[in-house]
Each structure stands twice: as C-alpha cells, then as structure tokens.
C-alpha cells in the first residue's frame, strides 16, 4: 500500500481509485449479500466514496449502460437511496438531483416506457457535472483523509 503522502500527491482520479480500490477488490465477484455486508461495514466516508465510484465507474457507457450494470444492486439494496446518501455526504446537491431524475427514468424504463430523449439529457447533465465532482471528491479526500483512506483489516 502507498504511503499517505504519495496518495495525496496523485492526480484526482488516481487518488479516488487508490482509496476505493481495496473495497472494490473485496466485493468483486461476490454475491449480492456479501457485497451488502462489506458495504455496511464501511465508514461513512468510504461508503460515500464507494457509491461515487459505483456511479462514475458504471456511467462509463452512458445512462443505459449504468442501468444495465446496477440492476443487480437494486435487488439487494436501495441503490438510489445509497447513491443519494453518498452524494449528500460529499456535498453534491446537483448530483443528488441528477440521481433522482435517473431513478425516475429507470422506473419508466422498467415499466416499458423508455424515453431516449430523457436518457440523452441525463447523459449530458452527468458529463457536465462529473469533472467538478471528481475535483470535489479528491479535494475532500485531501482535506479529510482519515474518512476515506483504506484502513488496515
């Protein structure tokens, strides 16, 4: 594991990944119940960071790709509530609003009422918000490293 000072000097996205990767390694390939157990053991900061990475990592292929990837989480936990809670902890009100709109769009899609224009708009909003969100998360990690840095098991 890197030393704290080395972590703090990383570029923003690399810093976020270095802090969240140990959690991702713990849940990768596990059952939904096992993932939920790991999630519940995290501190508030680590939980928020994990949810940020769930959003950011799964949005790589757009909103519909995100929906496809997280549908399994919706079965095990209230993914929408967890995402909003994470963004609230990180202080990203605009992301909370976006997640609420995503939740509504996801429900419409699940009911067979997909709205491609709405999905494209949500993609655009996300792309506009994510650069400042990444900076904000990295700044928060640097300001309060004890809340986010991986601990020893």
Segments predicted by a language model, with ranges:
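Extended, alpha-helix-rich binding/interface surfaces that flank or overlap catalytic cores
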Residues: 1-79, 86-153
């Amino acid at each position: 594991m890197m030393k704290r000072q080395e972590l703090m000097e990383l570029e923003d996205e690399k810093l976020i990944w270095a802090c969240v990767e140990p959690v991702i390694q713990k849940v990768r390939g596990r059952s939904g119940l096992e993932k939920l157990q790991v999630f519940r053991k995290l501190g508030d900061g680590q939980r928020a960071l994990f949810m940020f990475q769930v959003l950011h990592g799964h949005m790589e292929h757009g909103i519909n790709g995100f929906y496809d990837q997280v549908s399994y989480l919706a079965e095990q936990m209230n993914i929408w509530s967890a995402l909003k809670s994470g963004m609230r902890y990180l202080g990203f009100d605009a992301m909370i609003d976006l997640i609420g709109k995503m939740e509504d769009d996801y429900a419409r899609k699940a009911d067979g009422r997909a709205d491609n224009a709405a999905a494209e708009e949500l993609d655009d909003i996300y792309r506009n918000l994510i650069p400042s969100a990444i900076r904000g998360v990295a700044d928060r990690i640097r300001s309060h490293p004890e809340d986010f840095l991986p601990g020893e098991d």
